[in-house]
A protein has these predicted regions:
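Cell wall/extracellular polymer interaction/catalysis modules
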Residues: 1-121, 125-131
Length: 131
């Protein structure tokens, strides 16, 4: 199982910044170890999901018309995704990353699908349990 970790910092206005770590080093490809990817995230302070551990899978997004990571089992919510974005006020619960973050997530899911028999992924969110 792969675990992605999101560590939130304190909110600044409507923005909650965080750092997402994607552990590429858990299994090397072609005997070449890779470094973890560390990404910046943004969330809307009014709509953040509770801290905890959630299943993460890549599914088709009708809104964005492409495959995107979907955060599962969020209490009283659905459709929470991780996608590119820079303005937290435009989000109603999704976790925003920059273009590099979206590309890193694509690489991770492609590797899981192509090399590791679709091994499950978990998203662990730490910090800011209640705002």
């Amino acid at each position: 199982m792969f675990k992605i970790t999101l560590k939130r910092s304190r909110p600044t206005g409507k923005a909650v910044r965080g750092t997402m770590t994607i552990p590429f080093t858990q299994r090397p490809v072609n005997d070449k170890p890779e470094q973890d990817a560390v990404l910046d995230t943004l969330e809307n302070a009014d709509f953040i999901i509770p801290a905890g551990t959630y299943p993460l899978e890549r599914t088709w997004s009708p809104k964005f018309k492409k495959l995107l990571p979907l955060v599962g089992d969020v209490p009283d919510r659905e459709g929470i995704r991780i996608h590119r974005g820079t303005i937290p006020e435009h989000s109603t619960g999704c976790i925003l990353t920059d273009a590099r973050g979206s590309a890193c997530l694509d690489v991770l899911f492609n590797r899981l699908e192509n090399y590791y028999d679709n091994e499950p992924i978990q998203l662990q969110i730490l910090g800011q349990e209640t705002l």
